[in-house]
Amino acid sequence: MRKTKIILIIILFFIGSFSALKFTRSYFSDTEKVLGNSIQVGTWGESAPTSTPTPTEGTPTPETTSTPTPTSTPSNLADHVVISEIMVKGDSADDEFIELYNPTSSNVNLSSWSIQYRGGGAATYYRKNFEANDIIPAHGFLLIGNTAYNGSVSVDMIHNTFSLSSDGGTVFLVNNQTTLTDAADNGPTVVDKVAYGTGTSLRPEGSAYSTAPAQNQSIERKAYSTSDTASMTSGLDTNKGNAYDSEDNASDFVLRTTSQPQNTSSTTEIP
């Protein structure tokens, strides 16, 4: 009887050990991981998956701001009154004019200045003085005409001191009323000068504008270095003034097939 109890106890011990071992393996066969509010079940011996952070929505993306390219300023624009257009012959030999342009933002009083001329083959300088109230407006014009001038635009100053040669000559704008000499015609009193055509006595800035305008034609100062006859007569530079001055008459002017005189009452033009 005692032997039977011992055998029974041994059997129960083995049964209990087997059950405990089975329970333990079952318990550890699955790994439980709590992530946030969810449970992830993995297989024994494997690493639990790692959660990947979700990108925050609504985070602004930096924008690249482009830097504007500065607008270039046209070069060689005069900062003083210039001779802007010359017609040497209209309906008659003395139907002629000289036009001035003021590219500055202030009126300029010319009452103590003079306009002077020397023919292409001559040795004499001729002078016509400006008078009181000869004021050229800011970005405006002033028109000087011979007594034989008969254009539709009225002159601001009329004279019969000289006649522009149809072959060639030099026009001087001088800031005093002293007649020029060979020694002074390139000096500081000469504000501007323009030589056109041919002649041994031409006194140009740089080179003369070699073409002498024909009847009713004129030579006109450019608005910019890129200006040409088309842009000055019917293109983008028509109303941009006549400020270009590279100190070379040959480069600074274009030939107009039809002259276009402007006076102090004409619309101002800003370069």
Please state what every model-predicted region is.
Residues A48-S218, K222-S225, T229, I270-P271:
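Activation on beta-sandwich/Ig-like modules and their edge loops
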Residues A20-F23, F28, G187, A243-A250:
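Alpha-helical architecture
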Residues R2-T67, T71:
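Short, polar/proline-rich extracytoplasmic segments that appear immediately after membrane translocation
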Residues G16-S17, K89, S231-S234:
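Short hydrophobic/aromatic segments of transmembrane alpha-helices and their interfaces
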Residues S38-P49, S246-P271:
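A recurrent domain-boundary module in secreted/ectodomain proteins
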Residues T211-S259:
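Extracellular low-complexity, Gly/Ser/Thr-rich intrinsically disordered linkers
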Residues F13-G16, N76, L236:
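Residue-level detector of alpha-helix boundary/anchor positions
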Residues F23, F28, V174-Q177, A223, ...:
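Enriched for extracellular/lumenal, surface-exposed ectodomains of secreted and cell-surface proteins
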